[in-house]
Structure formats: C-alpha cells, structure tokens
C-alpha cells in the first residue's frame, strides 16, 4: 500500500499536475483500470458549440485523468489504459482534438471490434498480475455522449451475472434531487 504523504509521478497528468500526493489510504488494496471512451482514430460523438467542434474522446480522456488522479490520492493503484503523452489534464473551455491517443503505448486500431479487444487484452493481462496483490480490482469505462433529447443523460451499468452485489448495484435507480 502507498503510504500517506508519498508522492507519485504520473506524466500523463501534464507538467503542472504530474506530481500526485497520496492523502488517504481509503482505497489501499484497490486497483482500477481507467479507460476513456474512443480515442485514436475514433473521436466518438462530435458536436458543436458556436464555432468550436467538440469531440467526445477529448472530454472523456480529461475526465478519466481527473478520476485516475483522485483515485491515486486516495491510495489506489491505477492503470490508465488510453493514453495521450501530450494532452494531460486541461482546464480549457474547449478541448482541441487529436489522434495521438494510444492503448498503453500501442496504436489504437480503426476497427471497432479490434479496438475493444485491444483494451480487454490490456486489462486482462494487467489483472492477471494485479489480482494477486489487490483485494479489489475494477475497470471503469468513461463515455460522455448522450442520445436522450429530453434529459440529455444516459447511464449504463454492466454487471457480472456471477455476483449478486454487482447485479444489485446495477439495478439501483438514480433519481434527480
């Protein structure tokens, strides 16, 4: 477990935020595989705000990095599966698009099935090592598009059929305050 006060260097967060101080051990023993949706040749959903073209993968990546950093601060082991060595966490109102993202250093295939298989293979290989060292291992996939015109939200839960707790969590109804 990472000790409180330990500093971790993660260049993917960018120059200003690459230094991550562990402030809690609340997630000690936990390991997360954080995957931002799309990336590389696939920008995901594309929209416009005025003259600014918005690409889903850029916002999903930024959110994934912020989540990964927060998990690390809480003492978790974190693997960032989709990576862009240049972008880092950005505070710009509009994030520019790039196709530099890789799957842990490997080019992301254009074919959707190959892209998904690549991510699964990376996570499964890491999990085979991590399962011996961590009591809790989970993959988190982040997408930010929405197809609902009314509420503009989509929430999907995928769960293991073998675990009752997993199914219970997926069935929790999320209501507006």
Segments (PLM) and residue ranges:
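Catalytic-site microenvironment of enzymes
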Residues: 1-177
């Amino acid at each position: 477990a990472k000790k409180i006060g330990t500093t971790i260097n993660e260049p993917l967060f960018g120059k200003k935020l690459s230094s991550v101080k562990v402030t809690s051990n609340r997630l000690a023993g936990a390991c997360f595989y954080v995957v931002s949706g799309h990336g590389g040749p696939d920008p995901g959903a594309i929209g416009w705000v005025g003259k600014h073209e918005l690409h889903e993968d850029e916002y999903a990546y930024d959110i994934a990095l912020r989540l990964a950093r927060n998990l690390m601060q809480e003492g978790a082991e974190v693997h960032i599966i989709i990576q862009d060595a240049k972008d880092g966490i950005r505070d710009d109102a509009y994030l520019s698009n790039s196709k530099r993202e890789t799957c842990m250093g490997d080019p992301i295939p254009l074919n959707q099935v190959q892209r998904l298989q690549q991510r699964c293979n990376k996570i499964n290989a890491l999990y085979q090592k991590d399962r011996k060292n961590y009591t809790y291992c989970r993959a988190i996939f982040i997408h930010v598009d929405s197809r609902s015109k009314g509420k503009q939200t989509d929430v999907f839960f995928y769960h293991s059929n073998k675990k009752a707790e997993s199914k219970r969590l997926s069935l929790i109804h999320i209501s507006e305050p």
